[in-house]
Amino acid sequence: MDDVMDDTVELQALPIVQVIDDAVMPPKRAEVTDDLEAVYPIVEMFHSVQGEGFHAGTSSIFIRFGGCNLACPWCDTEFDKWTNMTLREIIGVMEPMPCKRIVLTGGEPALQDLECLGRVLKPLGYSLAIETNGTIVLPEGVLDWVCVSPKDQEYPKVAIRQNTGDELKAVWLLSLIHI
């Protein structure tokens, strides 16, 4: 029985945030004592109507963050260019917008300090939804709606860590289906 192969695999702890080689990560933020001075990499902010999913047709404020821990070849989001804005500046842009529902998107919004966003924005009456690739566990009690859009067909070795949510977004690439 000496020629029997040992199929055992040593399990290793996975990092909290998995990063693909070509990923564009936002810079680390310095610690701040005032939440309103927390800085976020903002690609764009705009008011629009949610166009997909359960909340399609709902008036929403979209905050698109820079940086992503994946590098999906089909992604058309320019998340590698952003403007650093304080939370105070972000609120100033949102205040005149006619709704209180925020959709956090990206890039990968779970790379940001979501707890700080929740501490400041929820008492102001905002609800927070997120569109995430699911590779980062989200803080509990901060988000009102979670849409997980896994990319495991492109990154089969990247673990989906956010295994609960309100909505699953499945994106099928025709090149993978081979019709």
Where are these regions (language model features)?
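S-adenosyl-L-methionine
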Residues: 54
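Glycine-rich S-adenosyl-L-methionine
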Residues: 163, 170-175
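Short, conserved loop/helix-junction motifs that constitute active-site signature segments
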Residues: 139-142, 158-165
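Short, polar loop motifs at secondary-structure junctions
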Residues: 131-138, 150-154, 174-175
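Radical SAM enzyme core and accessory elements
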Residues: 1-37
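Conserved small/polar residues in nucleotide/adenosyl-binding loops
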Residues: 177-179
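Hydrophobic faces of well-ordered beta-strands that scaffold small-molecule active sites
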Residues: 128-130, 146-148, 168-170
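Conserved Radical SAM active-site core
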Residues: 27, 35-36, 40-47, 59-66, ...
